[in-house]
């Protein structure tokens, strides 16, 4: 479930920023790596998937995905998150599939 994965990473990043916990930092990096690798599988080319079982995200979850990706972009500085958020926001403006 994509929103849960993204929200978990956001929360972990905020925790690490506050505590500087090395174990949490390492775990967060592993979560980021796994999510970077899986993210293309959540992109249908015209919408986001709610989960890898192939169910399209509802409009509200698709919007939430975009917001979380933008938050990750701000927290990490990794352009992948902003690029994906921009592409998915475009899907929304065009009305999806």
Task: Spell out what each predicted region is.
Residues 1-16, 57-73:
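Well-ordered alpha-helical segments within folded domains of soluble proteins
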Residues 2, 6, 22-29, 59, ...:
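Non-membrane alpha-helical structural segments and their capping/turn regions in soluble enzymes
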Residues 18, 62-97:
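Terminal, non-catalytic domain-edge segments
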Residues 22-47, 83-97:
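Long, well-ordered core segments of solenoidal/helical folds
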Residues 24, 38, 42-72, 78:
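H/E-rich (His + Asp/Glu) clusters that bind or coordinate divalent metals
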């Amino acid at each position: 479930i994509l929103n849960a994965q993204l929200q978990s990473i956001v929360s972990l990043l905020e925790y690490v920023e506050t505590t500087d916990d090395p174990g949490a930092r390492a775990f967060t990096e592993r979560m980021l790596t796994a999510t970077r690798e899986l993210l293309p599988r959540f992109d249908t080319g015209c919408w986001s998937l709610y989960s890898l079982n192939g169910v399209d995200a509802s409009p509200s979850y698709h919007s939430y995905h975009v917001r979380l990706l933008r938050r990750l972009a701000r927290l990490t500085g990794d352009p992948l998150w902003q690029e994906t958020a921009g592409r998915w926001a475009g899907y929304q403006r065009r009305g999806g599939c």
